[in-house]
């Protein structure tokens, strides 16, 4: 498992990021989007319009 920072843009234009542990970039992005859709991040948007993950 590696530590990734996931950068996302919501449907409201908010830029949010999350730090997650995952085994790949695609898994990290999936975890980040799930967190966003589940309301776990401090933002008003819940739909991810753009997403990218980088190793921390």
Where do the PLM segments sit?
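Short aromatic-glycine-(Arg/Gly/Cys) micro-motifs in beta-strand/loop hairpins
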Residues: 1-16
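A short, exposed loop/beta-hairpin motif centered on an aromatic-Gly-Thr core
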Residues: 14-24
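Short, mixed-charge low-complexity intrinsically disordered segments
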Residues: 33-56
